[in-house]
């Protein structure tokens, strides 16, 4: 009983921590999970990251366990993950890994794939591993479905699905800044994040992303000038992704190199693009 599945990374439009409402978009970087189930009644689960064997596999092991518990089977399992989403890139590698792990385990069992169940078990696993504050339903759905999702994270509801109408690139900056998840400070900017979210609901995703980035970078003591540097180099919009320290900048193809050059003085960069084709079982 084997199965492989992939799920996307995602970038932030609105971080949901301040208000409970968030938005994210799928990017063309993926994590693949390969699951093999063993019907031996021992319930031993072993995981490994092929790209980074020193990375603890506790999240994907938890995902497999939760799926097996849900379907009330006592199989053992082996799970390996690989992909091109950099760890700590701000591109929701944990959402991608958990979605892919759950999907591959359900596939290996031969059970019918139900999107709500996949997302619920993936988010449950992230909560149990203390990897999320809000459940990251926006990140999880953008990773799973692709495109743009606008969500009520508290109620786990998708309020709106959309996609970018233009052919654009995503330049990701991964600086060596110390991560800061000060929830109290993020709650202080709630009213202003609400204003950015209104832009998002109206379909003005570029402005929403930029405003969100300014607000959260200020609250978390990350430099806001980086986003302006990206604009100066020709980006359409730019802002902090998630709780940082990474930033995302969206630009037209002809400005890709200028934007990358403006950002890479702050750290490593990755260039990708939005993706509307979400998670799927490969075989």
UniProtKB/Swiss-Prot annotation:
It holds the Pfam family GHMP_kinases_N. GO terms for cellular component: cytoplasm. Its main location: cytoplasm. It is found in: Cytoplasm. InterPro entries: GHMP_kinase_C_dom (IPR013750), GHMP_kinase_C_sf (IPR036554), GHMP_kinase_N_dom (IPR006204), Ribosomal_Su5_D2-typ_SF (IPR020568), Ribsml_uS5_D2-typ_fold_subgr (IPR014721), SK_arc (IPR010189). It catalyses: shikimate + ATP = 3-phosphoshikimate + ADP + H(+). PANTHER family: HOMOSERINE/4-DIPHOSPHOCYTIDYL-2-C-METHYL-D-ERYTHRITOL KINASE, SHIKIMATE KINASE. This is Shikimate kinase. It comes from Methanococcus maripaludis (strain C7 / ATCC BAA-1331).
């Amino acid at each position: 009983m084997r199965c492989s599945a992939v799920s996307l990374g995602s970038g932030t439009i609105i971080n949901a921590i301040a208000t409970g409402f968030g938005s994210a978009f799928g990017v063309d970087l993926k994590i693949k999970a390969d699951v093999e189930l063993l019907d031996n009644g021992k319930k031993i689960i072993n995981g490994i990251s092929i790209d980074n064997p020193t990375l603890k596999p506790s999240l994907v092991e938890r995902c497999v366990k939760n799926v097996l518990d849900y379907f009330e089977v006592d199989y053992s399992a082996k799970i390996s993950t690989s992909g091109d989403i950099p760890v700590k890139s701000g591109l929701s590698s944990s959402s991608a890994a958990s979605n892919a792990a759950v999907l591959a385990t359900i596939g290996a069992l031969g059970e019918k794939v139900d999107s709500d169940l996949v997302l619920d078990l993936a988010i449950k696993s992230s909560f149990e591993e203390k990897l999320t504050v809000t459940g990251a339903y926006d990140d999880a759905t953008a990773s799973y479905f692709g495109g743009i999702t606008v969500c009520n994270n508290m109620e786990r509801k998708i309020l709106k699905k959309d996609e970018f109408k233009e052919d654009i690139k995503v330049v990701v900056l991964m600086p060596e800044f110390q991560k800061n998840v000060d929830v109290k400070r993020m709650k202080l900017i709630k009213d202003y994040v609400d204003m950015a979210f209104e832009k998002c609901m109206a379909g003005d995703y570029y402005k929403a992303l930029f405003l969100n980035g300014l607000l959260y970078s200020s609250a978390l003591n990350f430099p806001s000038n980086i986003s302006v540097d990206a604009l100066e180099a020709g980006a359409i919009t730019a802002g902090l992704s998630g709780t940082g320290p990474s930033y995302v900048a969206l630009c037209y193809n002809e400005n890709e190199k200028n934007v990358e050059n403006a950002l890479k003085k702050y750290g490593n960069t990755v260039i990708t693009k939005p993706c509307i084709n979400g998670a799927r079982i490969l075989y």
